[in-house]
Curated annotation (Swiss-Prot):
This is Homoserine O-succinyltransferase. The record marks S192 as: Important for substrate specificity. The active site is at C142, H235, E237. Belongs to the MetA family. InterPro entries: Class_I_gatase-like, HST_MetA, MetA_family. It comes from Shewanella halifaxensis (strain HAW-EB4). One of its GO terms (cellular component) is cytoplasm. The gene is metAS.
Amino acid sequence: MPVKIPDDLPAAEILESENIFVMSETRAANQDIRPMKVLILNLMPNKIETETQLLRLLGNTPLQVDVDLLRIHDKASKHTSIDHMNNFYRDFEQVRQKNYDGLIITGAPLGQIEFEEVLYWDHIREIIDWSQQHVTSVLFLCWAAHAALYHLFGLNRSLLTTKRSGVFTHKRTSEHYPLLRGFDDEFFAPHSRFAEMDIDKLKAHPELQVLTESETAGAYMVLCKNNRNLFVMGHPEYQKSTLKDEYYRDLEQGLAPEVPQNYFTNNDPLQAPIARWHSHGSLLVSNWLNYYVYQLTPYNLDDMTGITPWGT
C-alpha cells in the first residue's frame, strides 16, 4: 500500500526512483478505492490444493481481493468432485462480458504434449485473447506461460530429455522494475516441467523483457513491455510438500523420476524437504498485485481504456 506524504516533499523523487509507492496528499484526498477483482483459471489436477496455494499468496497483501474461479470445461475433474466444481467454479460464458483487474492462469500437467494436441487448446487461446481486452494484468504460471508465449508471440518451447524438477537459484537481470522491488540479488524458486523456452529468443524479442533467470533453469520471469502480461516459468505458489508429492506420484506410476534437485535434506528423498522459496513467492505475487494490478487498473472496470502502464 502507498505511503502518503506531503506535496512537494524532497524525498518523493528519491523514493519514486526506488519504486517505493508514495502518494501525495492531494492525490490521496481524491483517491477512489475498491476491491481488486481477480479471476483464476485453474488447470491443475488437484483443484483444491492449487486454489489454496494461490489464495494464500493473494491473501498475504493488505488489498481486498474478490476472487472468481474459472474452469476450462464442465467435464468432471479426475481429482476434484463435480459438486465442488459446480458450486465454486464459473464457465467462461459466465465471465465473457466481464472485466477483471487481474487474471492468473495456472500450470497444467501437459508438458510433453504439443499445444495444438491439447484437447482444450482452442479454449485456452480464446481466453488468452479475451484477457488482452478484458483484464488489466495477466499472470501466467509454468505451462500457461509457455502456452501464452507461443500463442501471443509465436515462441515455442523445447522439450527436455528429463523433467526439470527442483529448487534453483535465480538472479535479477533487470533493474528498476516495480515487480522486482524487495528482491534479493539471488533467490530460490521451484520448477516442475518437461520443457523450457529459449532465453536468447526471449531476450531478443522487442516486446519482452527477461527480468530474472537461472543458470540451471533458464528464464524465470518475463514481462511484456506494456506491463500487461507476466510469464513465470516456475511454480512460486507451490507449498513445501508439492514437489515431494509429485515425485512419489511419478514413482508409483513407474516413471522412474529423478530426485528433485536442491529440495530434500541432503538431496535424500527419505528426508524432509526444505522450502526456500516462500518469501520470494509471496513478494512476487504481492508486487504483481500492487504495481501491475492495483496501480494500473481503472477505477471503473467498464472502461478498460483507463489503464496507465508504468514507464520503464
